[in-house]
Design a protein with these regions (language model features):
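Extracellular fibronectin type III
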Residues: 146-158
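Surface-exposed, short loops/turns at beta-strand junctions within beta-sandwich domains
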Residues: 123-132
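Solvent-exposed loop/turn segments flanking beta-strands in beta-repeat/beta-sandwich domains
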Residues: 74-100
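Solvent-exposed serine/threonine-rich low-complexity stretches and specific carbohydrate-binding patches
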Residues: 97-113, 154
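Short, compositionally biased P/S/T/A/G/V-rich stretches that sit at domain boundaries
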Residues: 20-70, 159-167
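Aromatic sugar-binding surface patches on proteins
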Residues: 111-122
């Protein structure tokens, strides 16, 4: 997951001709008509959260932020992980519309039983004290639209979030 953050930082340092620090997002997860009822997606566990609310004074990346959330599933193969998408719902702290994708995202497998969802934005409004504190819910969803159990995610620029294994 750290390599994803490094890759984004490197992209932002390239000249405008090489990259304009484009906003990146996990691909959209597409539903399919089910021939039979899909099972409820397995429960996910948050393993890591990389959160950068806004890049610094770089020419091409000023104000661009991103988040990458690594999820783990017990007993789910990489192939079956592709049949699970994720809605992200803000619970608190998200002050700007359009900061969180409104569509379900497909996770990118990162290791056996683990997958990552990520997205970026341009411009974010912090809390009055200057910090950003997001509380989110990640809701797994099957190809036929059956929703699973939501999992809580906390991302903040201060120490207000528990460690990922405490979520």
């Amino acid at each position: 997951l750290k390599s994803l953050a490094i890759a984004l930082a490197l992209l932002c340092t390239l000249p405008h001709s090489a990259a304009a620090c484009s906003l990146f997002v996990s691909p959209e997860f597409h539903f399919r008509r089910a021939k039979r009822s899909s099972p409820v997606p397995p429960a996910a566990v948050v393993r890591d959260v990389d959160f950068v609310p806004a890049m610094g004074d770089s020419d091409s990346c000023d104000g661009v932020g991103f988040i990458a959330i690594e999820l783990e599933f017990a007993g789910l193969s990489d192939r079956k992980a592709r049949d699970v998408g994720f809605f992200v719902r803000p619970v608190s702290g998200v002050h700007d519309t359009g900061t969180i994708p409104s569509f379900p995202m497909a996770a990118v497998p990162s290791a056996r039983g683990k997958a990552t969802i990520h997205w970026a934005w341009s411009g974010i409004t912090p809390d009055p004290d200057g910090h950003v504190r997001w509380r989110l819910e990640i809701v797994p969803v099957s190809r036929s639209g059956v929703a699973g159990e939501p999992v809580a995610v906390c991302a903040a620029t201060d120490d207000s979030c528990p460690k990922a294994h405490e979520n």
